[in-house]
Amino acid sequence: RGIFRPDRSHAKSARSVAETMGNYHPHGDASIYDTLVRMAQPWSLRYPLVDGQGNFGSPGNDPPAAMRYCVTGDALVRLPFGQSVRLRDVVAGARSSSDNAIDLKVLNRHGDPVVADKLFHSGEHETYTVRTAEGYEVTGTANHPLLCLVDVGGVPTLLWKLTEEIRPGDHVVLQRTPPTEFGPADWQDAFEALHLGAFISEGFVSENRAGFNNLDREFFNAVLTAYDTIVGGPRYVSSRTIASDSLLHELDVHNLTALKKSRLGELVGQRSADKAVPEWLWKAPAVVKRVFLQALFEGDGSCSALPRNTIQVSYSTRSGRLAKDIQQMLLEFGVISRRYVHATGEHKVVLTSRAQAELFAAQIGFGGIKQAKLQGLLDALPQAAAGRDGDYVPGLAQFVRKHSGSRWVDKDWLNRHNIDRLSRWQRDGAEILGRIADPDVRAIAQELTDGRFYYARVASVTDSGVQPVYSLRVDTDDHSFITNGFVSHNTEARLTPLAMEMLREIDEETVDFIPNYDGRVQEPTVLPSRFPNLLANGSGGIAVGMATNIPPHN
């Protein structure tokens, strides 16, 4: 209560809700925040117990603002149809500490489109970066909540955790629902994406000259057609036999006048280590991004068979920024990858499971002859996948086995089989559910294994310094939106002097304390309550079929 005293500055509503949920009410934050809002509304309580700062609704049933939390402006907010936008670019030139009305459709935690109606530029604050073992990152303030998978008394539960509460070894939720696509790509955007991907991988654009080469004649011709259509101007084409006895096809451009006027002009003079996905491409729909990734992987990507009947798809680059961008764009298609720095200094993005290789082949693929090689490797695998991969629900197997309520024969089957891997649920989900007797256990298992989420282990939470931070107000019950694949949540408050009277002398052995739900902290059985809240503000309830109401008193 010391943080929320009336003689101190207002604290973020997020912090109040998170501490209540973490210590006393592990059943979601909506009811906690609704209660906080009601206690701040003078038309709801005769004597409000919370001093709210911000939009806490109105007597005319205008809804309160969502709890405000903040991430850095470079975070990519996911939009419908596979589009995305940097948070700082939602409102160009937004002033520090400003509220900006918007009308933007974003995706919520389930991958469904919802409306964001406000962008908050919250000024500059201390920030922290959450990084997963795979290399996914998001940076935000200490009070920014991310959706996590938490063990609550042995039950794997989706709960919000503040960045300051997240520790290495925790599991954060990444949204990986493939985008909804609507119609074919605009031909100009598709051509621009094709030759952008090709030139980033196997081309160069210096101040005075540009070029591209590739061994695949059909892919080379596709890039050449795109170049002539989008850029135009003089260029030279040739072929030569290289040391491996392969025929290399080359495009050479000496006059860059036309090229500099096109979107390829962004690459002029760019070093290999500085390559990145341009902002216009992030805002493009999935059908355009797919063309870019196909060309990119056909250039510097590869696929190969690994032991234990699995396949690796990888991309190598000298640019750490490009590797990070590629990993993020793959995630937008639902493909999970790992990012790391090789001993040679190259940054690698790799898919090391059969399931992800199959998803890559189906959702994206290579842009040329390498796709046939990948499909051949996949076709050669046995029909049923063997072994274990990293795509699983932590704690699910133990929970199901302990609480299934099943017959002995079904319990024995559940104990002997791997039931926490997503690949197993996709293949044998009906059989697993048929062996779980308890309907609540079945419901929990189905929600966690429907494929929407990837449960990524946190590798580190590090200080990222003071940065400008932003947030969105989303017009839904849980106020969720997607930032860099992480599920983000989105008023400030403090107690009133009357509320402090309800807590006065609580630390002086005036009431009894008992362990909370998980035994980590103590909670009071009652409040000292020198202020008679039930009489002053009134109350109501139902017990044994009889309604009881106490009207408010002066």
Swiss-Prot record:
Heterotetramer, composed of two GyrA and two GyrB chains. In the heterotetramer, GyrA contains the active site tyrosine that forms a transient covalent intermediate with DNA, while GyrB binds cofactors and catalyzes ATP hydrolysis. Its EC number is 5.6.2.2. It is an enzyme of class 5 (isomerase). Residues 1-554 form the Topo IIA-type catalytic domain. This protein undergoes a protein self splicing that involves a post-translational excision of the intervening region (intein) followed by peptide ligation. It catalyses: ATP-dependent breakage, passage and rejoining of double-stranded DNA. The keyword DNA-binding applies. The keyword Nucleotide-binding applies. A type II topoisomerase that negatively supercoils closed circular double-stranded (ds) DNA in an ATP-dependent manner to modulate DNA topology and maintain chromosomes in an underwound state. Negative supercoiling favors strand separation, and DNA replication, transcription, recombination and repair, all of which involve strand separation. Also able to catalyze the interconversion of other topological isomers of dsDNA rings, including catenanes and knotted rings. Type II topoisomerases break and join 2 DNA strands simultaneously in an ATP-dependent manner. It comes from the Bacteria. Residues 195-335 form the DOD-type homing endonuclease domain. SMART domains: HintC, HintN, TOP4c. Disulfide bonds: none annotated. One of its GO terms (molecular function) is ATP binding. Keywords: ATP-binding, Autocatalytic cleavage, Cytoplasm, DNA-binding, Endonuclease, Hydrolase, Intron homing, Isomerase, Nuclease, Nucleotide-binding, Protein splicing, Topoisomerase. The active site is at Y69 (o-(5'-phospho-dna)-tyrosine intermediate). InterPro entries: Hint_dom_C, Hint_dom_N, Hint_dom_sf, Homing_endonucl, INTEIN, Intein_C, Intein_endonuc_central, Intein_N. This is DNA gyrase subunit A. It is found in: Cytoplasm.
